[in-house]
């Protein structure tokens, strides 16, 4: 019986950290890899790459824990989130806080193996991860904070590799914010009706009938910024082809969200994993020496 209870608790932690739903970690991973490849340039040192890949998964898990902790009194009123571990009682508030601390401590121990500049930047990463879940109560732009939180690995990656944060770094950071606002607005469109009822704020609510248009403008901005990064770093044809393919994926997403149907909007959100992957493959191809 004790083993059964322990197993159930571990499964609840697994769900709380969203390790069964890797999309969030992947959307955090791709910009991290973009930054590592541009900063190096090419293939980064194995240990630095390992630290960042592990850090992505750990901090995304920590972010999910604090997000559910912040939303624990709201999630029970939303159909999609009512059965999450905290509102369902599978995990207590004390356990969630302890799990968050453990995940952050492991992440920080990994960062301590890197240089001082990266360690200092990691403090801001923790602050962003903690603040984001609470922003949806106070502003209709929590997605901007999410973009900053998901993109903070970019200056950290540049700092870890070169101990500098050049113009390309900040252009990539801005591109990631625009991308995150676009894809998380698609995600928020799924819950828009429920969010209005319970008082949660989002860009999907703020943009209203102009949501599709603004998402499209943001996506164009992402492509333009990534093209500028390519020019600044002398990237090859493979990279620019990846931007074209990413643009085609954005067009596909626009078709999916055309009628604002929940399942289609969620499918559009999920499709952004391929955008990140394609852009990374383009970068890798540019630095590949045949």
Swiss-Prot record:
Cofactor: Mg(2+)
InterPro entries: HB_polyprenyltransferase-like, Prenyltransferase, UbiA_prenyltransferase, UbiA_prenylTrfase_CS, UbiA_sf
Domain of life the protein comes from: Bacteria
Entry keywords, A to Z: Cell inner membrane, Cell membrane, Magnesium, Membrane, Transferase, Transmembrane, Transmembrane helix, Ubiquinone biosynthesis
Catalytic activity, as annotated: all-trans-octaprenyl diphosphate + 4-hydroxybenzoate = 4-hydroxy-3-(all-trans-octaprenyl)benzoate + diphosphate
BP terms from Gene Ontology: ubiquinone biosynthetic process
Gene Ontology MF: a single term: 4-hydroxybenzoate polyprenyltransferase activity
Pathway participation: Cofactor biosynthesis; ubiquinone biosynthesis
Subcellular localization: Cell inner membrane
Membrane topology, from the record: Multi-pass membrane protein
Ranges annotated as spanning the membrane: 23-43, 46-66, 99-119, 141-161, 163-183, 213-233, 234-254, 268-288
Class of the enzyme per the UniProt entry, highest EC level: transferase
Enzyme Commission no: 2.5.1.39
GO cellular component, one term: plasma membrane
HAMAP family per record: UbiA (MF_01635)
Family designation: Belongs to the UbiA prenyltransferase family.
Described function: Catalyzes the prenylation of para-hydroxybenzoate (PHB) with an all-trans polyprenyl group. Mediates the second step in the final reaction sequence of ubiquinone-8 (UQ-8) biosynthesis, which is the condensation of the polyisoprenoid side chain with PHB, generating the first membrane-bound Q intermediate 3-octaprenyl-4-hydroxybenzoate.
Descriptive protein name: 4-hydroxybenzoate octaprenyltransferase
Organism: Shigella flexneri
